[in-house]
Amino acid sequence: MARKEIIDEITMKRAITRITYEIIERNKELDKLVLIGIKTRGVYLAKRIQERLQQLEGLEIPFGELDTRPFRDDKQAQEDTTEIDIDITGKDVILVDDVLYTGRTIRAAIDGIVKLGRPARVQLAVLVDRGHRELPIRADYVGKNIPTGHDEEIIVQMSEHDGNDSILIKRED
C-alpha cells in the first residue's frame, strides 16, 4: 500500500485558518456558537479552530467532544464517551471532523447532538471532503476538496495524536 503526503503542515494550518475566517464571516452572533469535535481527530481540529477564534475575535467559544460510535448504523454500538457539558439548546452548533466521506459519521453525530438538546442550527466543518457520499450531507466549511477513488484512503495526521501535521493518501496496491 503506497502512502503519499498530499498536504503538508503549512498548507494544513492555512486551511484551518481559512475555515475559521469563514465561520466568522457566516455567523453574525459568534457568542451563540458551540464547537463540537467528533472523536478523535475532529476534536483536535475543533480545538485549533477554537484557539484561532480566540486569537482573532477574543471570544472563548464553548467546546465539546462527541463520540459517534453509539449512534452508528453500520457498526456495533459501543460505550458512549461523549464529553459535552454545554446546553446546546438554541445555540449554533458547528460539528467538526477531519474527513467527510460517506456521510454516515455525520448522520450519527447529528443523532448524538439531537439527544443532547435542540440547537438553533447545526453546521459542518471538515478539513477534507473526499466525495463518495452515501447520504445527502454537505459540509458548510471545507479546508480541502480531495476527490478520491474507492480504493484510496485519506489519512489526516495531527500532532496532538500522531506527532506531526499532514494529510496522506493511501492507495491499495
Curated annotation (Swiss-Prot):
What GO MF terms are annotated? RNA binding; uracil phosphoribosyltransferase activity
Catalyzed reactions per annotation: UMP + diphosphate = 5-phospho-alpha-D-ribose 1-diphosphate + uracil
Fetch the Pfam families from UniProt: Pribosyltran
Any stretches that span the bilayer, and where are they?
A: none
Top-level taxon: Bacteria
Which Cys pairs are S-S linked?
Answer: none
Q: Which UniProt keywords apply?
A: Glycosyltransferase, RNA-binding, Transcription, Transcription regulation, Transcription termination, Transferase
Q: Which one GO biological process term can you cite for this protein?
A: DNA-templated transcription termination
Give the record's family classification: Belongs to the purine/pyrimidine phosphoribosyltransferase family. PyrR subfamily.
Protein name (record): Bifunctional protein PyrR
Identify the species of origin: Lactococcus lactis subsp. cremoris (strain SK11)
Q: Could you read off the lineage of the organism from its UniProt record?
A: Bacteria, Bacillati, Bacillota, Bacilli, Lactobacillales
